[in-house]
């Protein structure tokens, strides 16, 4: 909560700045016009006593500047919800009369909502701390999707793992390549699960897999020997039936251009730690035809609990880049979608949850892993995962 305390102090300083600026302005206007002399026999106006009022105006401006800069630096340095957009607009509009007041109001309001949310969350976690509602029988393995890696200082899952751990969960990560064929990723994940079993002595793991990671894990359970070591698989926005828009793009883009993109990606991924990354193999395994073949071959294990989650955006403009651009294309081919995957592709297993919120916002593919660390009205992504894991605990997993 240290960050939130600093953020809240900055917000308070900005509110103080607003009120004291109004008071100072009224004080100086009345003083400049000689009202104090007329009403109380006080100091004369600025025409008769310019030095007197210029000194006071200068002191007031200096004090107000100090209050403002302390506040704005604190909220800019600590707020997660301001994001790049509001920070940049705040800087730009700071030089524009009237617009700077509107932006200051937005900044104070946004930070205030963030502070209230985090305080509420901290209070709730404190109240249920003894219950350890996410302390499952088996640890949780979180499996990333395509084109991402598990970095130590840039968590793929945003603020979610910390929230789960605060409620008693033990978390591990897949640590597999960012781009590979489903079957190759399956082998990597099988090796990772064996490693966790060896090093910790746990009997099994509960897997939560996002996007292509869900296909990777289904393949691992069916094609490798790790099924006895997995209690449950929860897939998040996984394209179980593929992506028809991917079929279209791959059919339209010439092979030469595809290979150029693949070579560029593979070279970059290798520098970041991937071993033999394969961009095209990963992408082609997401085609609807490939997923249909995959589903005919890969069968669920009756001894493992499978469940799935999906979500959708309500409007293209509500998604963050690049999902705001891909949404219309995906909608044309796949219908309602999360910016990448169509609604019809999400459902898998014994239990299925489909998530959205009212209004234009919706919940994107990236929102489901807290990619932008954004608090969405009507959907608390961190608490959602807490309840998912708490549900696994209640089921004995």
Predicted region positions:
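Short aromatic-enriched loop/helix-cap "lid" or pocket-rim segments at secondary-structure transitions
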Residues: 154-155, 243-249, 317-322
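C-terminal catalytic-base region of ester-bond hydrolases, centering on the histidine
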Residues: 51-62, 89-92, 300-397
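Active-site catalytic motif of lipid deacylating hydrolases and related acyltransferases
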Residues: 132-204
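Extracellular/periplasmic catalytic domains that process cell-envelope and extracellular macromolecules
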Residues: 134-135, 225-228, 298-302
